[in-house]
Amino acid sequence: MSLIPRIFGDRRSSSMFDPFSIDVFDPFRELGFPGTNSGETSAFANTRIDWKETPEAHVFKADLPGLKLEEVKVEVEEDRVLQISGERNMEKEDKNDKWQRVERSSGKFMRRFRLPENAKMDQVKASMENGVLTVTVPKEEMKKPDVKSIEISG
C-alpha cells in the first residue's frame, strides 16, 4: 500500500474483501431499504466547529451547508456556556419517488463550549453567510499590572 496518491487514478477495486476499498460494502444498499446507512445522520450530528482565540475575542466557525438561519440556534447559558444547535429535516418523500442513494445527512446537532473567565457573555454576536456560522465572543481586556520603578541607590 502506497502512502503517495496515484497520479492516474485509483486502480483499486471496490471489493468487499478489500479493507482499503473506497466504497464500503452494504448488503442492503441495492435492495432499496431506506435508512440502512447507520451513519445517515452521524455526519450532521457530529458537526465540526473551529474555535479560534484572537487578542480581542473567541471566534467559533461551523460549516452548516444547506441550513437556513431559522434552523440554527445560538444560546448562552449561566456558567459561561455557549450552545450552538440546529436541525436539518429530511426532504419530504413523494410515494412515486424511488431513492437511488441518500448521502446528504439530516437530523439534529448540538455543541456546547465552556468559555474562559475573560469572555464577555453579554456581547456575543452571531452571523451566517454562505452556510458558515460565525459566533464571536469578545474578551475582557486584561488588566495590566501596575509597574512601579524603584530608584537604585548607590
Swiss-Prot record:
Query: Where is this gene product found?
Result: Cytoplasm
Extract the PANTHER family matched here: HEAT-SHOCK PROTEIN 20 FAMILY MEMBER
Q: Which Pfam families match?
A: HSP20
The protein, known as: 17.7 kDa class I heat shock protein
What InterPro entries does UniProt report for this protein, alphabetically? A-crystallin/Hsp20_dom (IPR002068), HSP20-like_chaperone (IPR008978), Small_HSP (IPR031107)
Keyword tags: Cytoplasm, Stress response
Provide the induction entry.
By heat stress.
Query: Where does the sHSP domain lie?
Result: 40-154
> Record keywords: Amino-acid biosynthesis included?
no
What is annotated about its quaternary structure and interactions?
Answer: Forms oligomeric structures.
On whether Cytoplasm is a keyword of this UniProt record, the answer is yes
Question: Which GO cellular component terms are attached?
Answer: cytoplasm
Q: Where, by residue number, does the polypeptide cross the bilayer?
A: none
Q: Which PROSITE patterns does the record associate with it?
A: SHSP (PS01031)
Family per UniProt? Belongs to the small heat shock protein (HSP20) family.
